[in-house]
Amino acid sequence: MGNSYAGQLKSARFEEALHNSIEASLRCSSVVPRPIFSQLYLDPDQHPFSSADVKPKVEDLDKDLVNRYTQNGSLDFSNNLTVNEMEDDEDDEEMSDSNSPPIPYSQKPAPEGSCTTDGFCQAGKDLRLVSLCMEQIDIPAGFLLVGAKSPNLPEHILVCAVDKRFLPDDHGKNALLGFSGNCIGCGERGFRYFTEFSNHINLKLTTQPKKQKHLKYYLVRSSQGVLSKGPLICWKECRSRQSSASCHSIKPSSSVSSTVTPENGTTNGYKSGFTQTDAANGNSSHGGKGSASSSTPAHTGNYSLSPRPSYASGDQATMFISGPPKKRHRGWYPGSPLPQPGLVVPVPTVRPLSRTEPLLSAPVPQTPLTGILQPRPIPAGETVIVPENLLSNSGVRPVILIGYGTLPYFYGNVGDIVVSPLLVNCYKIPQLENKDLEKLGLTGSQFLSVENMILLTIQYLVRLGPDQVPLREEFEQIMLKAMQEFTLRERALQIGAQCVPVSPGQLPWLARLIASVSQDLVHVVVTQNSLAEGISETLRTLSEMRHYQRLPDYVVVICASKIRGNEFCVVVLGQHQSRALAESMLTTSEFLKEISYELITGKVSFLASHFKTTSLGDDLDKLLEKMQQRRGDSVVTPFDGDLNECVSPQEAAAMIPTQNLDLDNETFHIYQPQLTVARKLLSQVCAIADSGSQSLDLGHFSKVDFIIIVPRSEVLVQQTLQRIRQSGVLVDLGLEENGTAHQRAEKYVVRLDNEIQTKFEVFMRRVKQNPYTLFVLVHDNSHVELTSVISGSLSHSEPSHGLADRVINCREVLEAFNLLVLQVSSFPYTLQTQQSRISSSNEVHWIQLDTGEDVGCEEKLYFGLSEYSKSLQWGITSPLLRCDETFEKMVNTLLERYPRLHSMVVRCYLLIQQYSEALMALTTMASLRDHSTPETLSIMDDLISSPGKNKSGRGHMLIIRVPSVQLAMLAKERLQEVRDKLGLQYRFEIILGNPATELSVATHFVARLKSWRGNEPEEWIPRTYQDLDGLPCIVILTGKDPLGETFPRSLKYCDLRLIDSSYLTRTALEQEVGLACCYVSKEVIRGPTVALDLSGKEQERAAVSENDSDELLIDLERPQSNSSAVTGTSGSIMENGVSSSSTADKSQKQSLTPSFQSPATSLGLDEGVSASSAGAGAGETLKQECDSLGPQMASSTTSKPSSSSSGPRTLPWPGQPIRGCRGPQAALPPVVILSKAAYSLLGSQKSGKLPSSSSLLPHADVAWVSSLRPLLNKDMSSEEQSLYYRQWTLARQHHADYSNQLDPASGTRNFHPRRLLLTGPPQVGKTGSYLQFLRILFRMLIRLLEVDVYDEEEINTDHNESSEVSQSEGEPWPDIESFSKMPFDVSVHDPKYSLMSLVYTEKLAGVKQEVIKESKVEEPRKRETVSIMLTKYAAYNTFHHCEQCRQYMDFTSASQMSDSTLHAFTFSSSMLGEEVQLYFIIPKSKESHFVFSKQGKHLESMRLPLVSDKNLNAVKSPIFTPSSGRHEHGLLNLFHAMEGISHLHLLVVKEYEMPLYRKYWPNHIMLVLPGMFNNAGVGAARFLIKELSYHNLELERNRLEELGIKRQCVWPFIVMMDDSCVLWNIHSVQEPSSQPMEVGVSSKNVSLKTVLQHIEATPKIVHYAILGIQKWSSKLTSQSLKAPFSRCHVHDFILLNTDLTQNVQYDFNRYFCEDADFNLRTNSSGLLICRFNNFSLMKKHVQVGGQRDFIIKPKIMVSESLAPILPLQYICAPDSEHTLLAAPAQFLLEKFLQHASYKLFPKAIHNFRSPVLAIDCYLNIGPEVAICYISSRPHSSNVNCEGVFFSGLLLYLCDSFVGADLKKFKFLKGATLCVICQDRSSLRQTIVRLELEDEWQFRLRDEFQTANSSDDKPLYFLTGRHV
């Protein structure tokens, strides 16, 4: 036995140590005692290889040792060694094959002639790291270099190449079993066994070769390329030896790495049974020969316990595997799942450890197996022989729940037992992070002992009672609570030692004590030797039992072994429980296969023959025949008559019902919640676009296209098509023409079937071909069939397997930048695992529906799962959620009789019989009434009697849910046969709802539906369930899952009695009840007792409260009993359509009162009610809704659309909730009949919003991460639930998300950036919501293609004035002779001046003062804007990208940044009185526009063209655009506006903003203003542009003069243009046609190039100073275009002649009105300003940057929350203690003047005859005042002010031209003066120089300064009064 007997070991000493160890571990509760083996073998004084070993007796060995060996025979080393000891002492010794002392591990001798030197391979090549560290080693992809340690060369590491799949990941997990490696030395490849490989590289081992032991390190290359020893290979999950379970204490078989996988994830989580070696069995068959085969003991591999190995997991396991397996890979699957009789069936076992450790949690990767080995002899104590005919004799197939410890082998009739791992993971304590443990209220050290776990299990089983089945999730919570209690108790005691654990001796009687209260339902069997004894005993008793004897439901088998400690398992014998547990282990697909197998093989024949007779014992078929003969040819009247009235079939077919005009099928509304959710989706898309990840660029797209992928359901396809057609979305998105949209809709909906591949390829081709279209792939019901492609190809599963994965997760979809994926699901849990591909921030959840305030305004409320649960507390006599107890009793009786059939088969047969007999009972055989359950009887009664009550013939729908297609077809045939024989075939229809086929409805029923609908075409047939509204029918709904089909309002009953214990996941259960979810009348929820249960007595008491109609009266949380005061809704009870007479109709009815004949279940927000395209009204509202996204959606940077928009509020809720047969009725929720198992989970809602089903496993394709986890809180919102599932669930191996594992490099998961998830309860209206989303997404893209431009009429216009100089209309250019004779119009017409001071003209003096609108100083008003589509000639901001202007924008790479050069340019300015240094940043590509010095370093000038140049592909004038604060939003991309031709464009930016502008506009020339202008206004920029341009003109003239060109030939113009100019138009006046009408104006969009080239071609252009164009307005009239040219102010976009205006300067101090000021100055200098009226400019409303006001703050902030500072605080008395402000002095002054006219110029207010006289300046001093501008320059032209008395005088920074001749102006008495100067001394000098004190009176207190500190150079001004 290897060297395990080393040391002087007497067996007595061994026993003593063993007992001491056990005793110590039992006594101790805190400190880990030193286990037995470390005491015996690791004593330092003992030499490990002493030769004087003593043979122990085989018996002792058997008794004591065997059970201490773990699976590989390795010794159970303690877990308190240090890491290093563990590294070396982890020798996994094997028991040798004889009883002799150990011999070294014998290995095959090396082949002849091969090298055996240590450190070299058998081919003689060196493998040592020292010699290979500099070599370039070539290794195949997927391999890693690792270092192996040879025991003979401790100082060396040998280099090997190993396939990394066989190595563990960073957490010590996921290494494949086995080995695959290559020799680096000789290059030999393909070693498949580590043993073979270790021989080849000469490891010369003394022990069994193990990769875990000998492959020690990863090898890494350093930065110098040297190969060196890297990190240790992490074979164990955890190295911390204190708290967690010992990882190496259970060894997997020889080359299985002990990977710990996530609990019940991909592995089975149990170890295979322990087989001893032959030697240990005393069967030394090999006689100690030193061959390799004899020395390797027979390992049992790891057994797959699952009938579908590809899904093998800890949650499902059955006993279907036989024979110990060979070692295989995880990816290989077993051949035959059926057991071979008589072979051993290994059963997983969990080995106990020494008692000191917490429970073991080391599941091993399963290796399913193919070959069947010969069974090895096994000690009798470890086997159980399953008795023959166990199932037949006892009628029970026992289920053995694996507990804790080693399960024995089972022989014999193993098909009759099932081994279930249901609770096994509850007994393993998972490895949890400390922080997670703290959250759970646990400490790492305190876990439960086995004894406690046994007692808890028994307690749980006792508590379950006879009806319930153990639920894993329930038990996990019990275990968690118990641990939390222990932790609390331990903390309370502070010292763990005082906590007395249950001793093994006490365990049996404590266990029996607990079980004694169970009324014999739980038995405890205690054995001494092994569990096998107890199990055998139990099975034997079972097989010998007589049927009448009562069995316990559970037998708990405890093995109280002294050696192994306690082990236990539970044998479930209860008829109901064992069946439920066995069936719940199969997945839905598996049990459906099982059912079809039972039907095909005829196993059901006994059952079928049982149901051939009625409950009274008559032969059913004969009885029906008899009834048919008695009736003869006639049939029961189809409607409007009793069941006894008969007519001929011809008459029946010809009966036409009255038309029902109330149908609201076609009118489509979209409701407020749907709008809100659509907006949430849109805002999430904007958030993705804004998130810097560059995964979505919304500015790129101009169109939206979509495809909707739905599961394989024909009805769902048709339903979705109907929604698309009714919503009009195809026309709205511009995808189809109005006429053809109906037919074309089909290409937008695709089913997940085998044809999807081709259709999807067509779609993806469209995606690739249309890069400017944003495609949306909607994956509806995305939780269905979300299996991975890989698992689908390996297992023979459904054809649809993996299709969704193939489509949604294919590479093209992930990479397409113009494709958004929207997954829509009511049960999204399977998409919310740790491996989810959707970021949790991209989930959009339906808005919480149960908020009180919504209820007031909406007719319909959603009635979903939690409302159903809560309705049980309403206390009404006929609840909405029911369990048919009578039916359940019948089922149980039958199940006992047919133990071999699946319970669903039995239930289905019974259900068919129930409905058949109910039909017969109600028509012909009243004697059968007592044999139908009252539930079934009342449903059928309602179904067949309701059409008879009136002429419309409308009735109810009943859904019977039968998941198995074969059973459903059987049910349809049987029921149809019974119906037809009873003559009811015209009364109600029976429809098979098979997802794979279309609906088929008998022609006479189609005719009836058509006549109700009225206007349907001849060939119309019902295609969706909603089309069946009002048709009395039974729909037998089949298929694995319900797929989201919407049912009509006439659905009244939903029979889910077949949905049983096989549906134990949250999704499976909830989606079944989801069938019945719908919108109901408000009354139902507000006063359920009134609406649903009005017996006569309560009608009288129902108080009608007038004032309560707006609030939610019945809180859903509060139970309300029948007798509590019932509050009705406003209005009388008759409104609900309930009258006492109708209640009396059928007194014996047990279901809802019959007055609700057709509850409108799914009116209102049906799944996907969508916006009405019918009627202009709705269309209008929609447009409004989209427009109301508001201007802020124009850029993609605003991610939240405004929700307070006016649009949607006006959308109509339907006025009448339901259109029934008699007036308006309440829409009611359908009644749902459940099986007992489902009822207990859905009906038992204790508190909170969610029913108990929410704590189940969320979906069969996911697994819990750990059995220790917090409970899903019942009040969690869906967002919180999502986060919970993302933390606590994992995708299983066959799940499509399984492959999305952690990225090892970054430690994060890959979320797909363009994928969203929309979740909302079933039937809440998600389809309508996402169709609306598509619509508003398109609107928003259009908004991005639209621009808001100012649309304001000119101000101060007087169209009556006729130009004195007549201009001939239609002239392209002005004639300078006649133009210069026109007077200049000094009035400012630009609408942005509407709140500024008027400029005085003689005409203004004649205006009556009352006419002028008084506009008090107000907040900056909202200027009028209008939305215009951008055209191909627009100027763009940075959000525009297209292929054509990519070169122009040049974003290619960061390296481009360095391609531009910085040049200083200095010139002197007389105005500034100093040198100015500007910087040019010139990209390489633009250098041709400049002249550099010979050395090429120094910038000399900017090239200018000649006046005579005629180049059609260029504009001559350089374009300057000053811009500030708009690096992203400024319209600086002129590529399209210039039609791509050559032009020179310079951005003028402030120094501090330069880096930003440079980043966004790397290919633009920048002109950077000096730092001193960082706070300056736009006046400074314009001043410097003009100064620079004049200086440059002189330089160019000098340069070109040397080339012989005359100075006056150089082009003197520049364009100065704002950064918000977006579009240019040309206008022409259309000739009026013959009939007298308004002359029209036609306008056309033109490019900036066209405008500039036209203006530059003006004859004698050099004689004009400024040329401009007018501002666009939608109200441009032919009147304003009468004169093609005006001599007036021009703004925003001007051609400036720098030569003529050399001496007219912009005021560089100015922030406001600098252009009007400059125009007035230019005009007074006698220069010509010309405006071209046939061109107009559109200016974009840009919300950021530009002339936006500074926020004026105090210089020293005292507190954060200061009141806003008022304009009058912008000035103060000099040297006062006033709050000083942090703003430029000039800015404060201009802002002050705008608001101070009342203070400064009281006489001027509204007195336009007496304006304020302003010398050399135009300043805005408020709109109430007119300013008369007078220039002081000699020879200047000024307005005539003869006889004008001025009301004030404004002197602003006046220069030496202003002299004492001011005295010639006349002033009113009391006129006021304001003199503004740079500082106090110049203020005094000015007053003296101008002799102002002669006429004006000053007071000391009239001196002011702007509220700046002295460092900020305040401005000073003095006021005075005229005397």
Curated annotation (Swiss-Prot):
<dbReference type="GO" id="GO:0003231">
    <property type="term" value="P:cardiac ventricle development"/>
</dbReference>
<dbReference type="InterPro" id="IPR049100">
    <property type="entry name" value="TAGT"/>
</dbReference>
<keyword id="KW-0812">Transmembrane</keyword>
<dbReference type="GO" id="GO:0016020">
    <property type="term" value="C:membrane"/>
</dbReference>
<dbReference type="GO" id="GO:0061205">
    <property type="term" value="P:paramesonephric duct development"/>
</dbReference>
<dbReference type="InterPro" id="IPR046926">
    <property type="entry name" value="GREB1_N"/>
</dbReference>
<keyword id="KW-1010">Non-syndromic deafness</keyword>
<keyword id="KW-0225">Disease variant</keyword>
<comment type="function">
    <text>Plays a major role in early metanephros and genital development.</text>
</comment>
<dbReference type="InterPro" id="IPR028422">
    <property type="entry name" value="GREB1"/>
</dbReference>
<dbReference type="GO" id="GO:0001656">
    <property type="term" value="P:metanephros development"/>
</dbReference>
<dbReference type="Pfam" id="PF20691">
    <property type="entry name" value="TAGT"/>
</dbReference>
<dbReference type="Pfam" id="PF20692">
    <property type="entry name" value="cpSF2-GREB1"/>
</dbReference>
<feature type="compositionally biased region" description="Polar residues">
    <location>
        <begin position="1119"/>
        <end position="1161"/>
    </location>
</feature>
<feature type="region of interest" description="Disordered">
    <location>
        <begin position="246"/>
        <end position="326"/>
    </location>
</feature>
<keyword id="KW-0472">Membrane</keyword>
<feature type="compositionally biased region" description="Polar residues">
    <location>
        <begin position="263"/>
        <end position="278"/>
    </location>
</feature>
<feature type="compositionally biased region" description="Low complexity">
    <location>
        <begin position="252"/>
        <end position="262"/>
    </location>
</feature>
<dbReference type="Pfam" id="PF20267">
    <property type="entry name" value="GREB1_C"/>
</dbReference>
<dbReference type="GO" id="GO:0055007">
    <property type="term" value="P:cardiac muscle cell differentiation"/>
</dbReference>
<protein>
    <recommendedName>
        <fullName>GREB1-like protein</fullName>
    </recommendedName>
</protein>
<dbReference type="GO" id="GO:0002009">
    <property type="term" value="P:morphogenesis of an epithelium"/>
</dbReference>
<dbReference type="InterPro" id="IPR048659">
    <property type="entry name" value="GREB1-like_2nd"/>
</dbReference>
<dbReference type="InterPro" id="IPR046927">
    <property type="entry name" value="GREB1-like_C"/>
</dbReference>
<dbReference type="GO" id="GO:0001658">
    <property type="term" value="P:branching involved in ureteric bud morphogenesis"/>
</dbReference>
<dbReference type="GO" id="GO:0048384">
    <property type="term" value="P:retinoic acid receptor signaling pathway"/>
</dbReference>
<dbReference type="Pfam" id="PF20688">
    <property type="entry name" value="GREB1_2nd"/>
</dbReference>
<feature type="compositionally biased region" description="Low complexity">
    <location>
        <begin position="1195"/>
        <end position="1206"/>
    </location>
</feature>
<dbReference type="GO" id="GO:0072177">
    <property type="term" value="P:mesonephric duct development"/>
</dbReference>
<dbReference type="InterPro" id="IPR048657">
    <property type="entry name" value="GREB1-like_cpSF2"/>
</dbReference>
<comment type="similarity">
    <text>Belongs to the GREB1 family.</text>
</comment>
<feature type="compositionally biased region" description="Polar residues">
    <location>
        <begin position="296"/>
        <end position="307"/>
    </location>
</feature>
<dbReference type="GO" id="GO:0035050">
    <property type="term" value="P:embryonic heart tube development"/>
</dbReference>
<dbReference type="GO" id="GO:0001822">
    <property type="term" value="P:kidney development"/>
</dbReference>
<keyword id="KW-0217">Developmental protein</keyword>
<feature type="transmembrane region" description="Helical">
    <location>
        <begin position="1843"/>
        <end position="1862"/>
    </location>
</feature>
<feature type="compositionally biased region" description="Acidic residues">
    <location>
        <begin position="87"/>
        <end position="96"/>
    </location>
</feature>
<keyword id="KW-1133">Transmembrane helix</keyword>
<dbReference type="GO" id="GO:0060065">
    <property type="term" value="P:uterus development"/>
</dbReference>
<dbReference type="GO" id="GO:0003151">
    <property type="term" value="P:outflow tract morphogenesis"/>
</dbReference>
<dbReference type="Pfam" id="PF15782">
    <property type="entry name" value="GREB1_N"/>
</dbReference>
<keyword id="KW-0209">Deafness</keyword>
